[in-house]
UniProtKB/Swiss-Prot annotation:
Protein name (record): Ribonuclease P protein component
A GO BP entry: tRNA 5'-leader removal
Protein family membership: Belongs to the RnpA family.
Catalyzed reactions: Endonucleolytic cleavage of RNA, removing 5'-extranucleotides from tRNA precursor
Entry function: RNaseP catalyzes the removal of the 5'-leader sequence from pre-tRNA to produce the mature 5'-terminus. It can also cleave other RNA substrates such as 4.5S RNA. The protein component plays an auxiliary but essential role in vivo by binding to the 5'-leader sequence and broadening the substrate specificity of the ribozyme.
Organism domain of life: Bacteria
NCBIfam families named among the record's database cross-references: rnpA (TIGR00188)
Keywords: Endonuclease, Hydrolase, Nuclease, RNA-binding, tRNA processing
HAMAP family linked: RNase_P
Amino acid sequence: MTTRQICTLPRQCKLRKADEFRAVLRNRIVFESLSLRLYVKPIDVDYARIGLIVAKRVERKAVRRNRIKRLIREAFRRHRQMLMGLDCVMQLRHPVELLDSTRIYQEAVMLFNKAARQL
């Protein structure tokens, strides 16, 4: 039998409460790309956390909203080592085509790189 690596995002790496989101959004360290906006706040822990905002008015279909969130979570999971000690909130700014999933992933990675370099 082969062993399979579990590739999930731990629960501690997710922002869940409204107060946690508010704290990051109030901090106002912002990085932007064409369709995404990343809010960042330094924290005193040895891991990174992420929260996602994909509003219904920006993307009407739930399937698309969920797909976008999965792509961003995967980008975060793969690059969270460089974001240690940061709370991040990623927000979708404009509607995007579902076929542009590689672009969404690349923009998320670019914003994570930018935040890691500057903080």
